[in-house]
Amino acid sequence: MEVLQDLGRQLVFPIDFESQSYTESISNKALYLITFFSFISGYLTESIKVSGIVFVLGLIVVLVIVLPPYSAYNKHRPQWANSGPTVVEPK
Amino acid sequence: MFSLNQRFQHVSSLALSCSFLVIALIAATSWLQLVKDNVFELESQLSHIRSATRFAKQKRYGGSAVNPTEVSKIRFNADFDFSRLFNWNTKQVFAYVTAEYEGDENPHTMNEITIWDKIIPSRDNATFTLSDIDAKYQLWDLESKITERPLTFKLHWNIQPWFGFLINGETTGSKTIELKKPVDKQKGK
């Protein structure tokens, strides 16, 4: 079980705060657009298949944009204060 | 959206909701398309309905040696065009002919028996001109008599869509006739 917990800690892939709000808003907007376009494309071509293909391809693109922890998503890491005791040097 | 797991769950759950929206839109617009095409008043022609009736003593027809049941075989001509039932959300169409009649002993019960059916899988083969075909299923009743009462023959359709509910309807060309009495001496015994 130790191994699994270690593996879990390795697979977190965090991103910084700015990128978290950015990925959330862009994935929401993209999915609403995909919904609209998949319906319209299917309606115009009169084919359920086209609708499904547009939806799945759009979903894959969103996942590729949002999921991986690109280095651009980790540029604004906050600098946390040291948690250990600070040494105050006497003057 | 902190970890990979959270990002994946957010995107996939929203995508599932969005796919339900697409499905609802497809079902709604295809139903409106059917209404616009006026399919609920489709015309059809049932003609030349004729029958051969015999007395059955077998138990599966509800008959007995003493009191045999009348069993009718029907032949008919049919002429219909169901290509308007096909739009982008139609998987297949089920067409069936029924005979409707009121009970003799219980006049307020309505009976409906399917005598013929057909699965139509595509728009290209949705126009039928059938002449002199045998019904697939024989016609008999719980009561021992089926002849000499008005039977209304109707052609119904049933759309099975890719998304959405089943849609039922019947065509306008119905025909009411009385089947001929069987020429058989067994009944007299």
Swiss-Prot record, chain B:
Keyword annotations of the record: Endoplasmic reticulum, Glycoprotein, Membrane, Signal-anchor, Transmembrane, Transmembrane helix
Membrane topology: Single-pass type II membrane protein
A GO CC annotation given for this chain: signal peptidase complex
Principal cellular location given in the protein's record: endoplasmic reticulum
Lumenal side stretches: 36-189
Record protein name field: Signal peptidase complex subunit 3
Record localization: Endoplasmic reticulum membrane
Function statement: Essential component of the signal peptidase complex (SPC) which catalyzes the cleavage of N-terminal signal sequences from nascent proteins as they are translocated into the lumen of the endoplasmic reticulum. Essential for the SPC catalytic activity, possibly by stabilizing and positioning the active center of the complex close to the lumenal surface. Essential for viability.
Stored Pfam families: SPC22
Glycosylation site list: N125
Gene Ontology biological-process annotations: protein targeting to ER; signal peptide processing
Oligomer status and interactors: Component of the signal peptidase complex (SPC) composed of a catalytic subunit SEC11 and three accessory subunits SPC1, SPC2 and SPC3. The complex induces a local thinning of the ER membrane which is used to measure the length of the signal peptide (SP) h-region of protein substrates. This ensures the selectivity of the complex towards h-regions shorter than 18-20 amino acids. SPC associates with the translocon complex.
TM region positions: 13-35
Cytoplasmic topological segments: 1-12
Family indicated by similarity: Belongs to the SPCS3 family.
